[in-house]
């Protein structure tokens, strides 16, 4: 999309598709509208944030969690209050409230701290408490309270705001560093924020030993931590992670937020091993898992089609 202000008619059409009041649009098409609104939100368009927020009346846990993620990636302080409203809304699904809290951490504004501290102390649900813990730590880090002049090498992932920054550069050789990080990622005595930083440093290293070290994270007792491991594998598009991701998706005893993230990661990798399992679980009894597989398959179909643009860009009259 160009740098010129987008006509209101385009915003209105994207909002219409995303909110889907008439139930006429399939989930995959609504994702494409969200993709367009994401691009506009990142350019500072407040109308895109407003359009996304209106769709939180929907009942799709998957879509709402993705909308919260997009708001967190927008960089807009304007998105803080809508996200606070979502965290405060106890009728929203856990995965949606978690993503809204994480989004507040991604935005990094100190005005979010009171609500995050409240639910870190009071929420009965561990994923919410842990997310708030991470978001608080990230806001403190971003605002210079805990940076200590760290040297962090730029990476290919810098366009995405992570729940925690990667660990700073290490003096050790890579093999020794990965061995150290592999022991730390599973060390329950270390703070959660520290272990998340370990996770993202391993992602940035990105070799096969780092992938195997990250795989150990699937043994963690925290569903939140396990789901982030799957998310990271989706970012890395690492074929070496496929067996572990398939195992997670196939495990019907695993919590939905972890299985859903494994499905999305498999969709990103999209090799021959991924397709059959995604097709199988697109009919899963757990809605968020089934929908994740459906969206993943749609993305794969788009990649195969050779289309230049995944986003839905409305054509409106001048």
From Swiss-Prot:
Gene3D superfamilies: Leucine-rich Repeat Variant. Its EC number is 1.14.99.29. Pathway: Protein modification; eIF5A hypusination. Its cofactor is Fe(2+). Binds 2 Fe(2+) ions per subunit. It is found in: Cytoplasm; Nucleus. HEAT-like PBS-type repeats lie at residues 96-122, 194-220, 225-251, 258-284. Its main location: cytoplasm. The keyword Metal-binding applies. It catalyses: [eIF5A protein]-deoxyhypusine + AH2 + O2 = [eIF5A protein]-hypusine + A + H2O. GO terms for molecular function: deoxyhypusine monooxygenase activity; metal ion binding. InterPro entries: ARM-like, ARM-type_fold, Armadillo, Deoxyhypusine_hydroxylase, PBS_lyase_HEAT. Belongs to the deoxyhypusine hydroxylase family. Catalyzes the hydroxylation of the N(6)-(4-aminobutyl)-L-lysine intermediate to form hypusine, an essential post-translational modification only found in mature eIF-5A factor. GO terms for biological process: regulation of cytoplasmic translation. The gene is lia1. Pfam families: HEAT_2 (PF13646). It is an enzyme of class 1 (oxidoreductase). This is Deoxyhypusine hydroxylase. Fe cation 1 binds at residues 65-66, 98-99. SMART domains: EZ_HEAT (SM00567). One of its GO terms (cellular component) is cytoplasm.
């Amino acid at each position: 999309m160009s740098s010129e202000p987008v006509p209101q008619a385009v915003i209105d059409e994207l909002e219409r598709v995303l909110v889907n009041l008439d139930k006429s649009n399939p989930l995959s098409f609504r994702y494409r509208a969200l993709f367009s609104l994401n691009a506009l939100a990142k350019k500072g368009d407040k109308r895109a944030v407003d359009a996304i927020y209106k769709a939180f009346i929907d009942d799709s846990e998957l879509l709402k969690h993705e909308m919260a993620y997009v708001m967190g990636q927008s960089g807009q302080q304007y998105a803080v209050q809508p996200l606070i409203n979502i965290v405060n809304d106890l009728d929203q699904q856990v995965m949606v409230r978690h993503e809204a809290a994480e989004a507040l951490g991604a935005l990094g504004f100190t005005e979010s701290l009171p609500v995050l501290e409240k639910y870190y102390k009071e929420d009965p649900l561990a994923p919410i408490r842990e997310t708030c813990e991470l978001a608080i730590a990230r806001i403190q880090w971003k605002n210079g309270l805990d940076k200590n002049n760290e040297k962090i090498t730029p990476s290919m992932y810098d366009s995405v705001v992570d729940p925690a920054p990667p660990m700073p550069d290490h003096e050790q050789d890579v093999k020794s560093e990965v061995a150290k990080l592999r022991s730390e990622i599973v060390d329950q005595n270390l703070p959660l924020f520290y272990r998340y930083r370990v996770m993202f440093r391993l992602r940035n290293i990105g070799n096969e030993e780092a992938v195997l070290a990250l795989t150990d994270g699937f043994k963690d007792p925290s569903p939140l931590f396990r789901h982030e491991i799957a998310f990271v594998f989706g970012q890395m598009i690492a074929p070496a992670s496929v067996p572990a991701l398939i195992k997670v998706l196939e495990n019907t005893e695993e919590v939905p937020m972890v299985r859903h993230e494994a499905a999305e990661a498999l969709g990103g990798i999209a090799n021959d091993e991924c397709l059959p399992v995604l097709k199988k679980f697109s009919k899963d009894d757990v809605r968020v898992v089934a929908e994740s597989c459906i969206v993943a398959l749609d993305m794969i179909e788009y990649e195969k089609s050779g289309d230049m643009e995944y986003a839905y860009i409305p054509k409106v009259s001048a």
